[in-house]
Every structure is written in C-alpha cells, then in structure tokens.
Amino acid sequence: MKRISIIIIAMLCSVAAFAQQQFDTDFTQTKVMKISGKTTEKAGHLVFDGNDHLTMTYSMPAGEYFIIEGNQVKINMDGKKADLDAEKVKMVQLQRATLLNCLSGNWEQAAIDNNAETSIAEANGLKTISIVAEGKVPKGGYKSVELTYRVSDGVLTRMVLEEAVGIINTYEIK
C-alpha cells in the first residue's frame, strides 16, 4: 500500500510540474489534410488563462480566430463562421475539453475523454506525451495527441492533434 501511495504521489508531482497554467504567446499552425495532401500554414497569437478561456487570433490569415469562453466556442476559420454552445453540441464539447485539458497540462483527462492510452518519452531536454486512441474514436475526438514540454520549466512548446477524419494540426508555441 505504501509503495502504491508513493507512486501516486510521484505521478501527481510529475503532472503538476508539467502543468502550464497560462499562455500569452505567438504560435504557428500547420494543417495537413491526409486525404488530399493539402497543407496550410497559419500563424497568430494565443492567450490562455489556465481555465476555460482560450483566444487564438490569426495574423496569417488575418481576421481568423478560434475562441473558447466558458462553454461558448466562436470560430472564424477557412471561410466558415460559427458560434457554438459546447453543452448542446457533444462533438464541440469533446474538442473544447481536449484542447483546454492539453493546454492546462491535464493530459490524463484528455486521454480518458478520447478513449486513449498514453506513453511518455524524454530526450534532449524535452518531455513528449503521446495520447493514442484505442478502438473507436469518440465523435469529435482525436485519434492521437502529442504534447511536447520543455523539461527545464514545464512549458508546452508543441501540440499535434490528429482528428479521426485525417486532419492533422501541429501547433508550435513560441
């Protein structure tokens, strides 16, 4: 019992060390559509308060945005605009929760929500957490998520989200 308690405490300390509470930084995004092979490059500014407010405003292409304010998700991307209530749209609810959990360092919950297993690797001063769905991916869920943190300060530097439909978004966080 004592050994299990020590392992659990060590795991919780590891999660806390790599939990990023807030962001106010620039980012780049590479979107790859596996079916068509089309690649799109984007860039912008990301602000995350550590809870349930995320704002991604794009400078390339200018005018695009992705915003989470509580349960509201506002999107203006790729010529499509939408204001969605995540509580009413299950697919949006899962995507919202996964993004917020990954940004806040709560990757274990993201794995549970996406019916996934996790693995952790550390090399060259970076810690990479891979989250890979097992079996059927929940509607709106991610087939895989890869999070890369700097070991020195626990800051998230890269996030790769692969949707079940074959779209891969790679975010490099400055």
Give the role of each language-model region.
Residues 20-32, 38-39, 78-135:
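Flexible, processing/modification-adjacent segments and terminal tails
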Residues 120-174:
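Gly/Pro-enriched, hydrophobic low-complexity segments
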Residues 14-16:
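N-terminal signal peptide c-region/cleavage motif recognized by signal peptidases
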